[in-house]
């Protein structure tokens, strides 16, 4: 793995609570997350796999690993962006996700791009 700035991706995430698919009485809280990925290095690189760590408010952790994202392994040129939306379900109204993407540059260099922790929160309703 390398920390060389030629091999770098920027990852930003936006989240949303999905009330129509959630059931509070059954402790089922559904969230979507939209991920914005940009190749900020100067070498073309392909996202090969993902590793998510999902933690609910009780500390229960679930790990999700798999090839690509939403069935794709995007190849990004320097400065190119890719965006996708996916979802997850928690047993609590609050949680956190974090992880990394495993990436291979066109020259064969492999590196991981960290996905900083982000919150999943059900909005509170005031009466």
From Swiss-Prot:
SUPFAM superfamilies, per the entry = ApaG-like
UniProt cross-references to InterPro entries, sorted A to Z = ApaG_domain, ApaG_sf, Uncharacterised_ApaG
Q: Which GO terms describe its biological process?
A: error-free translesion synthesis
The ApaG domain covers 3-127
Q: Do you know which NCBIfam families this protein is assigned to? A: PRK05461.1
Protein name per the record: Protein ApaG
